[in-house]
């Protein structure tokens, strides 16, 4: 029996890529998984994929830059699993769209909001 059995992990940006890989690995160790992601279609696919693997998963559509979305995710996670044991702040964006020289203040603000404020929200 794993030390992670029946523990609950929240993973932001969990619907694909590194986040989904982390969710899969943790779920295979017996953890309950809560995926938070802005992309609801990809989130539904990830939920179905993890469920097929026998992982107990809850997907919550959210924007990491919105504090109320974090609160909703936490409320739903606790309602479903009773407690949150681990948080993986995985959501992030590589850069603003387009060339750096053409990046305006609004685009840089978006990068900072997701990559920095999303972690401390």
Q: How should these model regions be labeled?
A:
Residues 5, 53-56, 76-87, 107:
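A glycine-rich helix->loop->beta "capping" turn
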Residues 91-96:
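Conserved NAD(P)H cofactor-binding loop of Rossmann-fold oxidoreductase domains
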Residues 12-21, 42, 47, 59-64:
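A structural preference for long, well-packed, hydrophobic secondary-structure segments
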Residues 98-100, 107-110:
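Substrate-binding pocket helix/loop in short-chain dehydrogenase/reductase
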């Amino acid at each position: 029996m794993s030390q992670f059995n029946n523990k609950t992990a929240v993973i932001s940006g969990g619907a694909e890529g590194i986040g989904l890989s982390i969710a899969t690995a943790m779920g295979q160790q017996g953890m309950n998984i809560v995926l938070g992601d802005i992309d609801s279609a990809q989130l539904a696919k990830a939920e179905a994929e993890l469920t097929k693997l026998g992982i107990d998963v809850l997907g919550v559509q959210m924007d990491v830059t919105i504090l109320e979305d974090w609160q909703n995710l936490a409320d739903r996670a606790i309602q479903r699993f009773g407690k949150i044991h681990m948080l993986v702040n995985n959501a992030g964006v590589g850069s603003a769209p387009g060339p750096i020289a053409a990046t305006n203040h609004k685009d840089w603000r978006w990068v900072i909001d997701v990559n920095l404020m999303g972690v401390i929200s």
